[in-house]
Design a protein with these regions (language model features):
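Active-site acidic/histidine proton-transfer and metal-coordination neighborhood
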Residues: 1-67, 75-77
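Histidine-acidic metal/acid-base catalytic patches
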Residues: 50-153
Length: 153
């Protein structure tokens, strides 16, 4: 799986045109990726942290070489980020789990069990990656978070 991004619209490009550009270019990239046997996972990032914007793009790209690179820490301002993550989980081909999650614009400790359960409920069968960006000493924090994730999986 190669992680890909939709990017940000260039100045003067409408949201509608930006979405059309992403769809057209991802379809081309999927054709090439398929020739090489490579999956492309588009991450909910930048312009696509808004799941209402991301899902129509994902659904428009009908390719066996395409899916979502699920990132639990990249969600637009919402009071229920878990609900938004559950919407992209069924399309996920790779999952990056962060220990913090944005809730109404503020970072909170992520409910790792809830994230793993929503992936399980979507029949996710891919890799789960810990992407640590927390404020604690990573040499102490990462082993603890890995243990929690292993127990949940």
């Amino acid at each position: 799986v190669i992680r890909v991004f939709g990017g940000k619209p260039n100045k003067g490009v409408s949201e509608k045109q930006a979405v059309q550009n992403i769809i057209a270019n991802m379809k081309l990239a999927c054709d090439y990726a398929g020739e090489k046997g490579v999956m492309l996972g588009m991450e909910n990032h930048d312009f696509l942290i808004d799941i209402d914007r991301m899902l129509p793009i994902v659904e428009a790209i009908d390719s066996p070489w395409f899916g979502v690179n699920f990132d639990s820490g990249n969600i637009a301002r919402t009071s229920n980020p878990y609900k938004e993550l559950a919407r992209i989980a069924p399309y996920s081909i790779n999952a990056q789990i962060k220990v913090e999650i944005p809730v109404d614009g503020s970072k909170e400790h992520a409910d790792l069990a809830r994230i793993i359960n929503l992936l399980k409920n979507a029949n996710y069968r891919g890799y789960i990656v810990l992407e640590y960006e927390g404020g604690e000493d990573p040499y102490k924090a990462i082993p603890s978070y890995l243990k929690k994730l292993r127990n949940l999986i």
